[in-house]
């Protein structure tokens, strides 16, 4: 059992609720129909059911289990469900007894819902999912779910423990830099003109310098851990 018995809700949600009488693309409707077998609202994690303090941003975390027809599910399906339910959601995808946890950094303000990038685990046994309830209030429980599921993807660039939103923005910045570097390297390989090649290489050095800040702190932390264990 992943979560306390007190949090159990166990309500089946007809998948048609997310596409009947709603504006939805044909591709998204097809994904709901073909990729999903059953949707269950398994748990309601609240300050009352978890016996912790309320959060400033997070009132409830809904645990939605989606049984799949295959291992593939389009993320646009999760995004649609996220936008229909005005609470924070932890998704558990199930296929043939194996599970994946999916979660997005979801911002809810003045009834406006913004769903950001999804983080997910590998396929695991249900009891092995990194979804431990950690924190003294609902905000910290939610943030810790994201950090547990995202893992190394959010461990970038600073010795200081920043807030989750800053970490996510920094991880996205790192990803974009890596993408720019990869594109530029491909362009350099194709460029024949010497002057243009020099110009592109200078640009590449600048991007690599910007990327260094994301790795220098990680290296320092590794050295510190090795030093501690050696004494």
Task: Indicate residue ranges for each PLM-predicted region.
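N-terminal, leucine/charged-rich tether regions that mediate assembly and partner docking
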Residues: 1-96
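Extended assembly-interface/linker segments at domain junctions
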Residues: 74-160
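Intrinsic-disorder/low-complexity, polar/charged segments
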Residues: 25-26, 137, 163, 193
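Alpha-helical oligomerization segments
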Residues: 158-161, 167, 171-221
């Amino acid at each position: 059992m992943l979560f306390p018995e007190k949090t159990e809700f166990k309500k089946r949600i007809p998948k048609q609720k997310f596409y009947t009488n709603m504006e939805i693309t044909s591709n998204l409707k097809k994904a709901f129909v073909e990729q999903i077998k059953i949707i269950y609202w398994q748990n309601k994690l609240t300050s009352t059911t978890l016996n912790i303090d309320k959060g400033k941003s997070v009132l409830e975390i809904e645990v939605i289990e989606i049984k799949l027809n295959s291992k593939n599910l389009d993320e646009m399906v999760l995004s649609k469900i996220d936008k229909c339910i005005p609470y924070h959601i932890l998704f558990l995808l199930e296929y043939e007894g194996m599970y994946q946890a999916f979660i997005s950094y979801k911002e809810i303000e003045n009834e406006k819902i913004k769903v950001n990038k999804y983080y997910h685990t590998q396929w695991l046994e249900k009891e092995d999912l990194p979804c431990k309830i950690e924190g003294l209030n609902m905000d910290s429980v939610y943030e810790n779910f994201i950090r547990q599921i995202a893992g190394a993807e959010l461990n970038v660039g600073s010795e200081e423990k920043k807030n989750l939103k800053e970490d996510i923005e920094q991880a996205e910045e790192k990803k974009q830099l890596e993408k720019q570097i990869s594109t530029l390297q491909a362009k350099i390989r194709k460029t024949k003109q010497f002057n243009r090649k020099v110009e592109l290489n200078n640009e590449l050095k600048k991007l690599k310098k910007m990327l260094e800040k994301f790795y220098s702190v990680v290296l320092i932390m590794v050295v510190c851990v090795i030093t501690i264990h050696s004494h």
